[in-house]
Amino acid sequence: MPSLSQKKEEVLKGLLRQEKSLPPKYFYDERGSKLFDQITNLPEYYITRTEIQLYQELLPSLARIIDLKKLCVVEFGAGSVKKIRLILEHLSVEAYVPIDISSDHLNLAAEQLSREYPQVDIFALSADYTKPSELPERFDTYDKLGFFPGSSIGNFEKADAESFLIGTNKTLGTGCRVLI
């Protein structure tokens, strides 16, 4: 999790800009995460619905392309872990690490997912997913697939997107793959 001084610095940076802004990651406390989940279920919000439809159509083919043997999926900005279910249904996933800034919301979602998929080793990591994180040692021997669904990367400034992708590589390690 970002320290208080890091949060202050990021907020001040956004408020001192000519076009004021706040980092979107700070919208997603427990209440914000629940609100976003409700928004994604509205008929007007086509992004989630379209993305899920694309996954349903393309995941069988992607499974053949990805073809990792001992697979750990690391989801950046996991939120309610809604979309990972499609991955779990199509790929032979042995471990799953959802990363999100909203720890309460994340832990609740991960507990529910653990009940649905008891064969998958699930470890919820409460952290700022835009920064590199250290995964527990028990995942060192796994092939890693980074998963960053949605249009979230479109919310990043170019430099922030580049920094995120570099951090993703640091989190996952060499030889990883990423599905965005």
Segments from the language model and where they lie:
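A short, conserved alpha-helix within the catalytic core of class I
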Residues: 155-167
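Class I SAM-dependent methyltransferase Rossmann-like catalytic core
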Residues: 20-65
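N-terminal auxiliary segments of SAM/dcSAM-dependent transferases
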Residues: 1-26, 33
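Conserved class I S-adenosyl-L-methionine
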Residues: 69-79
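Conserved beta-strand signature within the Rossmann-like core of class I S-adenosyl-L-methionine
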Residues: 171-180
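Conserved SAM-binding strand-loop segment of SAM-dependent methyltransferases
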Residues: 117-131
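Conserved SAM/SAH-binding beta-strand->alpha-helix loop
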Residues: 102-103
